[in-house]
Structure formats: structure tokens, C-alpha cells
Amino acid sequence: MAADDYFSLFGLPSKFAIDAQALEEAWRLVAARVHPDRYATASAAERRVAMQWAARANEAYRLLRDPMLRARYLCESAGIDLQTESNTAMAPAFLMQQMEWREMLDDARHDERARAALGEELEQAREAMRASLAELIDTRQDYAAAGQKVREWMFIEKLAQELAAVQP
């Protein structure tokens, strides 16, 4: 079994907008083919290779089923260094949105309606990111712009985690 990337491992096109059901079916087929139990009577080397392929299939499935991780993977595969640790530059409009969301998060600590409103806004932002990334990656192949969107989405996910940690 050979696969250059996670998409080809499952026989899927390398794109952002993927068919989730096709991904799951492909993963099940690959996982069944390389499951270590199938190699119980094989040599130690063959069992080790089967375990490595099973781990690779599981990691590929975990990454590809998450839209943000899939977008990040596609950008990095196209040679874009997201510099997630060092590059904090964002578009001015997104910076303003961040400030507004931070204020809403502060309010959410004491107000159930504010919590619900922020949760709804973040979900809408996620949907907008999905649509934008499908356009940037699948249609325009503008991986640099997509990389910027992925960094913005990472902020949204971090904020969503902070919101989830807010106690009612």
C-alpha cells in the first residue's frame, strides 16, 4: 500500500469541499485492509507495518474530517507556512471583529443571552470560513489567502473553546 498524501490514501480528490460520507467509507475500507488483527499470524515486521498503516489511516481520517485541519493541511501541502506561532498579523476588519467578540465573551461570563449570541456568531463565522475556504482553495487555488483564513479560523476556534469554558 502506498499513498503520497492523506487524500490519495483514501482515493479522494485533494480539495477542501469533500464528501464526508465518501471519506468515512474510504477510511473504513482502508482501516479494514490494514487492521493489525488481520496480520496476527504474520511476521513481526509485517505486523509492525500494518500497525503503522493503521495509525496513518486513523490520523489521515482525523485530520480530513475536520474542515479547519483539512484546510490547514491543504495550505501546508501547497507550501504555505502558516507561521501560527509567530505571525499574528490579521486584516484590520478581522482585528475589529476580534475585539467585539472579546467584549462579548466578557459579557458572556455573566449573561446567558450574551453567551448564546456569541455562540451563534461564532457558528456563523465558521460557516463563512468554510464557504470562503472552498472558494479560495478549490476554485481559485489561492493558498496564501486561504492560509490567512485558516489563521483567522484558528482564532475563532480558540475563542469558541474559551466560550465553552464559561460557566453558566
From Swiss-Prot:
Superkingdom of the organism of origin: Bacteria
Database matches in InterPro entries: DnaJ_domain, HscB, HscB_C_sf, HscB_oligo_C, J_dom_sf
A single GO BP: [2Fe-2S] cluster assembly
A Pfam family matched in the record: HSCB_C
Chain segments annotated as transmembrane: none
GO CC annotation terms, alphabetical: iron-sulfur cluster transfer complex
Disulfide bonds: none
UniProt keywords, alphabetically: Chaperone
Coiled coil: none
One Gene Ontology MF term: protein-folding chaperone binding
Domain J: start-end pairs: 5-77
Job description of the protein: Co-chaperone involved in the maturation of iron-sulfur cluster-containing proteins. Seems to help targeting proteins to be folded toward HscA.
Subunit relationships: Interacts with HscA and stimulates its ATPase activity.
Cross-referenced HAMAP family: HscB (MF_00682)
Family: Belongs to the HscB family.
UniProt name for this protein: Co-chaperone protein HscB homolog
Originating organism: Bordetella avium (strain 197N)
Gene that this sequence comes from: hscB
